Amino acid sequence: GAADLLPEWGKEYGIDMIPVNILFGEKSYLQGTELDNEGFYKLVDETKRIPKTSQPSPHQFVEFYRSIAQKGDTILSIHITAKLSGTYTSAVAAAEELKDEFKVIPIDSACGSLGIGLMCREARKMEKAGKSVDEIVQYIEGIKKVLSEGNPQQLDTIPLELPESLPSLD
């Protein structure tokens, strides 16, 4: 939803994203499923409106989690900061509802945009490397702390290998 996730990261690391609701006047669309980026910008041009967004409801999270997990699975669910959206709160409510089916660990990223994408990518890389859920959560919390506090002395601890498809800043 609110993560700026490079398309190749989503595919390469198998990252699932719950769509946010995009509202153009009275019409609502699910990001990515009912409205892709091209369609979004086309609607902005045609309607001359700035759309609004609405976080997924707890029910939408329950359905989403059930669509990507099986009984007994653990889901690490990283979200836009609760200071900007109710998404994290919806995820927490859904996690509580599903506690007898599987474990959902909602994380408030304390940021948005590319920071969330980075956390998701690193979590998947660690999972593929055989790290435990606790190790992954601890590492993501470390990235969150660096990104939210902005401590320049810790910047070298953030893994920022960018894909080759991005233009050079030189």
Summary of predicted features, one role per range:
Residues 95-115, 128, 132-137:
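Short, acidic/small-residue loops that bind anionic groups at enzyme active sites
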Residues 54-64:
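Glycine-rich, highly charged phosphate/nucleotide-binding loops
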Residues 1-55:
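N-terminal glycine-rich anion-binding loop in soluble enzyme alpha/beta folds
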Residues 79-99, 118-121:
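Short Gly/Thr/Asp-enriched flexible loops that form oxyanion-binding sites at enzyme active sites
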Residues 62-73:
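Glycine-rich phosphate/diphosphate-binding loops that line cofactor/substrate pockets in enzymes
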Residues 1-2, 22, 80, 109-112:
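Short, ordered loop/turn segments at secondary-structure junctions
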Residues 125-170:
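Internal, active-site/partner-interface "lid" segment
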Residues 74-81, 105-108, 122:
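Short glycine-rich or small-residue beta-strand-to-loop segments that form or flank ligand, phosphate
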